[in-house]
Curated annotation (Swiss-Prot):
Cofactor note (record): Binds 4 Mg(2+) or Mn(2+) ions per subunit.
Binding site for Mn(2+) 2: E298, N300
Residues binding ATP 1, per UniProt: R129, R169, G175, G176, K208, L210, E215, G241, I242, H243, Q284, E298
Written domain comment of the UniProt record: The large subunit is composed of 2 ATP-grasp domains that are involved in binding the 2 ATP molecules needed for carbamoyl phosphate synthesis. The N-terminal ATP-grasp domain (referred to as the carboxyphosphate synthetic component) catalyzes the ATP-dependent phosphorylation of hydrogencarbonate to carboxyphosphate and the subsequent nucleophilic attack by ammonia to form a carbamate intermediate.
Residues bound to Mg(2+) 3: Q821, E834
Span list, region Oligomerization domain: 402-547
Designated name of the protein: Carbamoyl phosphate synthase large chain
Length: 1067
């Protein structure tokens, strides 16, 4: 079928910032789609608010807009660009909802824009719970007993008719947002109230709970000629009742009979055909574990998180094929670019097993609600491939980059039963513990509902582990059969080291001595029936190896692993650009990573991809097989940097900044000595190894002090403590201080934080830009709003900052990228807070707003070039004409029990960028892009700590002057009233928020982070009711500026990336 010749320009809407439920998978799918459209000769216009994405690079689309993903802004872009078509299904739920809104409100008709691929009616039928149920009824497919409601009274009546427990599912939401399982009327009222607010059409489905049934997913694709194939079927190990994004998922399914498999496959094809979806589609089923009864749970009429997993699991490029189908091509006309020979109409075949395990943020939020249900809580996921389930399962656990719990603890049977009956993020580890304690698989099936197949396989891991522990001496003396069996089962060197009581590297030496080495197999979509042109490998312990090794110069790039707080998509952006930079210099680029959501693990990003855990063992195995000595770690976040020492000790050459310099930045004593010797101020600080030493040195420094563990990312475990009692609590509860795990203690210096990213070749230094944080020191840089260019530095201060940066680069022998964080105190004195000898999360932002390809130039330096050979630019690059504001984005609504108060520990999951000709407009855009519902009037509630009340006087006055009605809690109101301000006291702030009377909350915490305190309750209730809540007066001042100084016309202005005038570089 020929492509529609009327379509010459296509608009693609991205998914926006990384949030729980919508992560990097849409950068991957959007990038693939844009490339597919350009291959067909179409002009592509892309709009996305997330600057940390590959898809917002200027070479991905012909025109790129970093603008808020709202109806008004997209309408303005359509008006300006006049696209012929809109691709609605590759930007996640955000992109889909916007496309529907644009169609329903007549914008697409007005400007002559055609929805490509799946049409409006099909989207509405899949997303509207009522229409979808009617369709299933028409085609004879079973659906769960349920009813659509749009009010609380009807919800209660429906639940009582169906019988508790019930599941609540809001329409047009992502990640199960606003949904949940209700056991009683009280829980139902709470969930439905939030669900109705989250739904775009104020509609929720109340359905009978099938908790405990098997959950299966089918990824299906259909073209406009009604050709349809299934790409992959996936089985959730966790039964129905846990969101699939929080479930451990296996592909292909392991426990279905042939009859069950084909029953659900035919149902999937029947449903996608009835809906008329053109492109990829995900269909979820509940299957009775005792028979052939099944129900359709839901359909995603778009590329989804599961699509990304299915793509990486099979090698089938779902997003690329979906984009071509949207243009009118048939499956039998689209080449499979993995094999280069077959066509997209061939169903993939798998001769291996894939396991996905979610990555949760509870290492950051230990007090958050860790229970799992229908609302997703994971920030990211890992994927592993093996020849059997246990191998892929254990490799996935190894990929999580978490400290594995110690087993063989003395837990009684009742405690274990309680820990596994209800699903928590760590349930699988307690299942392992139960097997260590002798619990039978049959009992665990009764407790968990997990299919016995998986339980027996997990028991096999424990049985072998116990055997290895009891035969330790024999193994160390050369009895290697058990060792070889353990490697085939999937046990890593580190797991074996713990069982044998020896270091990892000794396990490695032992197995290499006896020739126990991995082989590598290829993922090719066709189980080796055809040769693949895009090498994509995984390790296993078998005889035949499928890797073809070249004699080219090659470099290994270590990726950043799963998306998590503190290490997000920004590092994948850097890894992808590192690969491209190597390829530009004719160096073979080989990447190791384990995140199925990302562009770095796409089939055609690198010369070779190894889908492996990011540990010393697996990285060295790849390096040894490929004959690689050079490795780049600067772009994989802290995960990669932590490998510098073991890889160097194993003989690998870490390109760029050396191991000595990396260690120097983390050793606080040496770090301070080096900077002090060059008269560069640092806050007084020490590395301490015991509680006694910490108390003594904190007293010497003087409170408040900033405390944190060494070698962490995202400020994990970082706090400001004000006295000795708080310090003792921190050292006993938050971290475990030992000689092996010291704690850093610095004096806390109040002031403004300034952030510098620089490129150095060891002699010359280039500073693309300086960013200034809005919130004062004490809020993690990832959680701060940040302005480029810095606006409050004098010429003299800027010169001093540049001078310090150059000195630091030279002192630490920086080759490549460096990130330095300064604080400017009230007396105008700079202090160096932190030096990161690696890429930071601001690299993508500065690269885009300055036009300087920071990663590319850094890689060239690592390969031996100097800055002089690369560019004529030196020192600080002059800023362009525009102002950009980075605004962090949080997922607090998904994480119950987590305090939203900002502090030195990072909490945001993503960020957006607002760019404009003036600061207020840039702030306004950034806040809109971050999905803040900014009130232009109404009631604003203040509840402030005593220390902040005087400072807040000016802000409160301005809110009143602008016509807002200011309310306050009792003590705060009394303070303002005494000073003559028109502030109304409220005794029931929580009730007012719940009723929807309050439009904004300003709450600065006192000493309390405890859930019982009123401040904590205020913050949580505001978040759960989608009301803007700010915990910093600095932020509130900026918000107020944006609200009162930006005119209606300014609010609608859009600027493509190509029109950014950048420091002498026009991109």
């Amino acid at each position: 079928m020929p492509i529609n010749k009327k379509i010459k320009k296509v608009l693609v809407i991205g998914s926006g910032p990384i949030i729980i439920g919508q992560a990097a998978e849409f950068d991957y799918s959007g990038t693939q789609a844009c490339k597919a459209l350009k291959e067909e000769g179409l002009e592509v216009v892309l709009v996305n608010s997330n600057p940390a994405t590959i898809m917002t690079d200027t070479d991905i689309a012909d025109q790129v807009y970093l603008e808020p993903l709202t109806f008004d802004y997209i309408t303005r872009i359509i008006e300006k660009e006049k696209p012929d078509g809109l691709l609605p299904t590759l930007g996640g739920q955000t992109g889909l909802n916007l496309a529907v809104e644009l169609a329903e409100k007549g914008v697409l008709d007005k400007f002559g824009v055609t929805l490509l691929g799946t049409n409006l009616e099909a989207i509405q039928k899949a997303e509207d719970r009522n229409l979808f149920r009617e369709l299933l009824d028409d085609i004879g497919e079973p659906f769960i007993e349920s009813k659509i409601v749009d009010n609380l009274k009807e919800a209660v009546q429906t639940a009582q008719q169906i019988g508790f427990p019930v599941i609540v599912r809001p329409a047009y939401t992502l990640g199960g947002s606003g949904g949940g399982i209700a056991e009683n009327v009280e829980e139902l009222k709470e969930i439905v109230t939030l669900g109705l607010k989250r739904s775009r059409i104020n509609q929720v489905l109340i359905e009978k709970s099938l908790y405990g049934w098997k959950e299966l997913e089918y990824e299906v694709i259909r073209d406009g000629n009604d050709n349809c194939i299934t790409i992959c079927n996936m089985e959730n190990i966790d039964p129905v009742g846990i969101h699939t994004g929080d479930s451990i998922v296996v592909a292909p399914s392991q426990t279905l009979s042939d009859k069950e498999y084909h029953l659900l496959r035919m149902a999937s094809i029947k449903i996608i055909k009835a809906l008329g979806i053109e492109g990829g589609c995900n269909i979820q089923f509940a299957l009775d574990p005792e028979g052939l009864d099944y129900y359709v749970i839901e359909v995603n009429p778009r590329v989804s998180r599961s699509s990304a997993l299915a793509s990486k699991a099979t090698g089938y490029p779902i997003a690329q094929v979906s984009a071509k189908i949207a243009l009118g091509l048939r499956l039998d006309e689209i080449k499979n670019i993995v094999t280069g020979k077959t066509y997209a109409c061939f169903e993939p075949a798998l001769d291996y097993v894939v396991t996905k395990i979610p990555r949760w943020p509870f290492d950051k939020f230990s007090k958050g609600d860790r229970s799992l249900g229908t609302q997703m809580k994971a920030t990211g996921e890992v994927m592993a491939i093996g020849r059997n389930f246990t191998e892929s399962f254990l490799k996935a656990i190894e990929s999580l980059d978490i400290r594995l719990p110690d087993f063989m603890e003395d837990l009684d049977r009742e405690s274990l039963e309680n820990r596994v009956k209800k699903a928590y993020d760590d349930r699988m580890f307690y299942i392992l513990q139960a097997f260590y304690n002798g619990v039978k698989p049959e009992d665990l099936y009764e407790w968990t509902g997990i299919d016995p197949f998986y339980l027996y396989k997990i028991e096999e891991i424990v049985r072998l582990s116990l055997k290895i522990s009891s035969n330790k001496d024999k193994i160390l003396k050369g009895e290697v059969n058990l060792l070889a069996r353990a490697k085939k089962l999937g046990l890593s060197d580190s797991m074996l080291g713990r069982l044998l009581g020896i270091p990892d590297f000794e396990v490695r030496d032992l197995r290499l001595k006896y020739g126990i080495k991995p082989t590598y197999k290829m993922v090719d979509t066709c189980a080796a029936e055809f040769a693949a042109e895009t090498p994509y490998y995984y390790s296993t312990y078998e005889e035949e190896d499928e890797v073809e090794v070249s004699d080219n110069r090659k470099v290994l790039v270590v990726g950043s692993g799963p998306i998590r707080i503190g290490q997000g998509i920004e590092f994948d952006y850097c890894s992808v650009h590192a690969v491209r930079a190597l390829q530009d210099r004719n160096v073979e680029a080989i990447i190791v990573n384990n995140n199925p959501e990302t562009v770095s693990t796409d089939f055609d990003t690198s010369d070779k991809l190894y889908f492996e855990p990011l540990t010393t063992e697996y990285v060295l195995n790849v390096a040894e097989r490929e004959g690689i000595t050079d490795v780049i770690l600067q772009f994989g976040g802290q995960t990669a940097i932590n490998l510098a020492e073991p890889l160097s000790e194993a003989g690998m050459n870490v390109l760029g900044t050396g191991l000595k310099s990396i260690n120097l930045t983390e050793d606080r004593k040496q770090f301070n000595q080096v900077l002090t010797s060059e008269k560069i101020p640092t806050p007084p600080g020490y590395t301490v190894f015991s509680i006694e030493e910490a108390l003594k040195l904190s007293h010497k420094i003087g409170y408040p002090v900033l405390v944190r563990p060494s070698y962490v990312l995202g400020g994990r475990g970082m706090e400001i403590v004000s006295n000795e009692a708080e310090l003792k609590t921190y050292l006993t509860d938050a971290v475990k201080i030992t000689p092996e795990h010291p704690v850093l203690i610095d004096r806390y210096i109040p002031g403004r934080e300034i952030e510098v990213d620089a490129i150095s070749d060891g002699n010359d230094v280039l500073i693309p830009g300086i960013m200034e944080h809005v919130e004062r020191a004490g809020v993690h840089s990832g959680d701060s709003m940040a302005i480029y260019p810095a606006r409050n530095l004098t010429t003299k201060q800027t010169r001093r900052l540049v001078n310090y940066t150059k000195k630091i680069c030279n002192l630490f022998g920086i080759k490549g990228i460096i990130n330095i964080q300064f604080v400017l105190d009230r007396d105008g004195q700079f202090y160096v807070l932190e030096v990161n000898p690696r890429a930071s999360r601001t690299v993508p932002i500065l690269s885009k707003v300055t036009g300087i390809p920071m990663v590319k130039w850094s890689v060239r330096i690592m390969l031996g070039e100097t800055l002089n050979q690369i560019t004529t630019l030196k020192g600080l690059v002059p800023p362009g004409d525009l102002i950009s504001v980075k605004v962090p984005v949080f997922s607090f609504d998904k994480l119950l029990g987590v305090d939203i108060h900002l502090n030195p520990e990072m909490k945001s999951t993503g960020e957006v960028l607002g760019t404009a000709e003036n600061l207020e407009q840039a702030i306004y855009k950034g806040l809109k892009a971050a999905d803040f519902d900014l009130p232009e009037g109404g009631k604003v509630l203040f509840s402030l700590a005593d220390r902040d009340k005087q400072e807040a006087l000016g802000v409160v006055c301005r809110f009143i002057e602008e016509g807002y009605q200011v309310l306050a809690t009792r003590k705060t109101a009394l303070y303002f009233q005494k000073r003559g301000l028109r502030v109304e006291k409220t005794e029931d702030p929580v009730g007012l928020i719940k009723k929807g009377d309050i439009k904004m909350v300003v709450n600065t915490p006192t000493r309390g982070k405890e859930p019982g305190r009123i401040g904590f309750k205020l913050r949580r209730i505001a978040v759960e009711h989608n009301i803007p809540c700010f915990t910093s007066l600095d932020t509130v001042e900026m918000v107020l500026q944006a609200l009162v100084r930006v005119g209606e016309e300014e609010k609608k202005e859009v600027i493509p990336l190509s029109e950014y005038k950048k420091g002498g570089v026009l991109v």
